[in-house]
Design a protein with these regions (language model features):
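Acidic catalytic loop of the alpha/beta-hydrolase fold
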Residues: 46-48, 72-76, 101
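Generic anion/oxyanion-binding catalytic loop in active/binding sites
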Residues: 9, 26, 70-73, 100
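Catalytic active-site module of serine/aspartate enzymes centered on a nucleophile-bearing elbow/loop
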Residues: 87-126
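Conserved alpha/beta-hydrolase catalytic His-Asp/Glu region
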Residues: 1-60
């Protein structure tokens, strides 16, 4: 599943050719990575359910937050991004057009700009 996911998470074929082999090498070179990845996928829904009580605490978080998602990410889709945005009052939501799961590889300039212009703690967000 990992091999299929990584290839689909990056929109640009040239970027995929450059980065996917590196991601595969890192995955293969880390013996604990595969069991952890498979365990994560098996445990994901039970883990989310067990932590739902912590969601209410997110509404109290008062630091600057920018939620940056690709609008073409079929896994963590725009609905997930909007839910995070609802949980974090005062957060800013950015859905990057055409970007997939690895939005930082699909649109590095936009993501960098959003990070570099992030409001400082204590400042008012736009």
């Amino acid at each position: 599943m990992y091999w299929w996911q990584v290839g689909r998470f990056i929109r640009d074929a040239d970027v995929r050719r450059e980065f996917v082999p590196l991601l595969y090498q890192q995955f293969d070179a880390t013996p604990s990575a595969q069991p952890a990845f498979f365990r994560l996928n098996v445990d994901l829904l039970p883990m989310v359910r067990s932590h739902t009580e912590k969601i209410l605490r997110l509404k109290e978080f008062r630091r600057p937050v920018r939620i940056i998602f690709g609008d073409a990410d079929y896994t963590l889709n725009s609905g997930v991004a909007r839910t995070f945005h609802e949980f974090l009052p005062g957060s800013e939501l950015f859905l990057i057009a055409g970007a997939r799961h690895f939005v930082q590889l699909d649109e590095p300039e936009q993501v960098a700009r959003l990070i570099l212009t992030m409001p400082s703690p204590g400042s008012k967000q736009a």
